[in-house]
Amino acid sequence: MPLRRCRAWRGHSQPGTGSRSNEIPKHRNVVAFLDDFSHVVCRGPTEQRVIIAAVGKLVDRIAQTGKVAGDQVAVFVATERFKQVKPSDQAGLRDADGLEQAGKLAVDVLQLELLDWLTESINGGSDFCLIILKIGEVDPMALILAKFVDSASPLKPAVLIHRAPAF
């Protein structure tokens, strides 16, 4: 299957921010972050396109603009049909089991902020959703996950092929 270029997110809604110290970046910050990964390609049918975005120096930028801690990695899950996923299936995006099996990582998903952000994104018809994962001492630049969402999820990616760019 040919590689596809993933479009930068141009959502219509302003994602809400969390009430705790680790807030989901505002719309303008997320767009700026995604623009830096305009070269990223992914494999699979349109409805299953998934990006694992590496961080590096960009984590520092989001830490300054979006109040995301420097020891967290921003993971972008992209699908044009995400807004059609049932709420019961969206839980798969917050399930750390796949990540733990793939990389034995200590993952802490900021569930409250994530749910608020997903609601705003789905209602706005956005193509991209943001998940913040705490990965502890693991080097984000070396993070390559073979499996992200649960196999029962309609968002299961065909292949995750993103590798962190060199800075």
UniProtKB/Swiss-Prot annotation:
Name under which the protein is recorded: Uncharacterized protein y4lJ
Source organism, top-level taxon: Bacteria
Key words, A-Z: Plasmid
Organism for this UniProt entry: Sinorhizobium fredii (strain NBRC 101917 / NGR234)
Segments of skewed composition (Basic residues): 1-10
Region Disordered, residue ranges: 1-23
